[in-house]
């Protein structure tokens, strides 16, 4: 029977080898490949212009003024989490409300009313569902082309632009289906708003 004394050195050697192999070499190679081939994705898909960071293209930002495009409802809780200086931090979480609950129905109704008031020219058009519901993450950066089109008249008027100019920006910020067949077309709200502000080129 092998003693513990004879087994431990071998076990320790195997542990060190696999730690070096998978903890250092493997992760280093994968990180290097990612930085070489997909540097933007590997570094968080941050939108940066002239050295200033404006956000991540994969995380939604909340816009409420008439001159910008509105995204999906965001679930934000800053009541509990603060940094060392007491500044509130933003955290998002999926909604736990049932679609059949009265509270959820009230939230949807309030959102519809707000959109109707902001976009009176679209009074006869049904409000796209993604403008009045939360996403699973609570921070979805995209909306449907229909939801973007619903806001064109308001955005054009607020920015003294033509509706076709706004549609051109939306088209430039629209992602197609994956491989042309999977998923749906989506519009990145942050990119649209940065183009409206003249920060990103059209």
Question: Can you describe what each PLM-predicted range is?
Answer:
Residues 149-202:
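Extracytoplasmic/periplasmic C-terminal soluble domains
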């Amino acid at each position: 029977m092998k003693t513990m004394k004879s087994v431990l050195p071998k076990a320790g050697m195997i542990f060190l080898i696999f730690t070096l192999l998978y903890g250092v070499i493997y992760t280093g190679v994968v990180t290097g490949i990612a930085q070489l081939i997909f540097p933007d994705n590997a570094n968080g898909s941050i939108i940066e212009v002239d050295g200033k960071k404006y956000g991540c293209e994969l995380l939604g930002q909340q816009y409420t003024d008439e001159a910008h495009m509105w995204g999906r409802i965001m679930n934000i809780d800053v009541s509990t989490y603060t940094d060392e200086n007491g500044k509130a931090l933003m955290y998002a979480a999926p909604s736990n409300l049932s679609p059949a609950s009265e509270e959820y129905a009230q939230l949807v109704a309030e959102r519809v009313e707000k959109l109707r008031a902001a976009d009176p020219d679209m009074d006869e058009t049904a409000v796209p569902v993604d403008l009045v519901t939360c996403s699973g993450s609570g921070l979805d950066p995209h909306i449907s082309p229909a939801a973007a089109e619903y806001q064109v008249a308001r955005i054009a008027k607020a920015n003294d632009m033509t509706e076709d100019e706004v549609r051109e920006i939306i088209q430039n910020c629209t992602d197609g289906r994956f491989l042309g067949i999977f998923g749906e077309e989506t519009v990145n709200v942050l990119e649209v708003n940065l183009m409206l502000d003249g920060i990103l080129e059209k």
